[in-house]
Amino acid sequence: DYGVLEDAVHRLMTDLTRKLHELRPDVLIEFRQNYIGPVMRQYGNMFRVGDCPYSTSYNRVGIVDLRLTSGRTAVHSDMLMWNPEDRVENAACQIENVLFANVQLSARLDRIPEEHLRMMRFWTRLMQDEQHLLQEAPLYAEQPQMLYPVVRTEEKGRSVIACYQHGVLAEVPASRLDDVYLINANSGSTMLARFDQKARWKATVWNCLGEIQTEEEWEPEGLVEWKIPECGMVRLQKVR
């Protein structure tokens, strides 16, 4: 018997976790917000955002909060669903808001239009190709009082910067980056970025379907604004 509830709960969870791992060493144990915190990492190996149907901002904030407090524990989004008749840009916005976590797609693939499927293939392929940069590289999030309008990861000269509100500024430290994804994850058609030094880049712009819009060399300096499709993306690769 235990005289303190917290000690009893700890013993219960420890015993359960140990027994489950004995039965299956690769068992997956998931906890969902708000029953989580750094101490819960010793009991589970997946943390998931709480229920937030069709709430892109709640999903994003939940993911960032988990990423910043969960170490290397896997972080999962809440499931994604949308109206098949919705604009493809709105559907893309849902996926873009969970780029920095393991996405849980629950949209019925047999009920959504081909345009939505093309969009999903593009973004899920990016998440697979850049899994380490998106989910394991150090994550930085700005202005929690504004629900993290800019979120980025950066490691070894590469970065992903996602802007979730139109008009927010993306800081691009060109002095230390060679490869940058800038994601316009909002309803605007322009992006603002500030480069800390002049450099020459190959700039490839995609719309949310993964269709290339422009591909050119570019030499931005200081504060710049340029056209990026709604929920589209530009990749900047430094030219040597």
What are these regions (language model features)?
Residues P229-M233:
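Tight coil/turn sites that cap or link beta-strands
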Residues D1-V9, W82:
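The substrate-binding groove and active-site-proximal loops of carbohydrate-active enzymes
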Residues R235-K238:
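Intrinsic low-complexity, polar/charged intrinsically disordered segments
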Residues L12-I228:
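Active-site-proximal substrate-binding groove within the catalytic cores of carbohydrate-active enzymes
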